[in-house]
Amino acid sequence: YAYQQVQEILSKKKYTGIFASNYISTLGTIFYMNEKDIKVPDDVSLIGFDDIMLTGLFKPKLTIVNQPLNLIAEAVVNSLLDRMKAPKDKGKITTIDAQLIIGESVKTI
């Protein structure tokens, strides 16, 4: 699905950068660009979202936004447990910082 989305977007207009909203979208974008011989970052800059071990295998190294999934999971579980203890409470907003990991997939075009 991500591959088709990128194909549709890039067939309509030339963009200088793409922010892929999740790991699957990042992969679809990479596959499409490789197939069409679009060079990252020379033709299009790419920022991915979610860091898993495979991102280190790509050349150039991807710039990514890393979410601490373990902290997110912990916050979700704690929120559910709090809700079970006090179902009528409004709940709370929890924020967890993400980290930008600079790679080699972005440049000024």
Enumerate the predicted regions with their spans.
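Structural motif
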Residues: 1-12
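Flexible loop/turn connectors
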Residues: 11-109
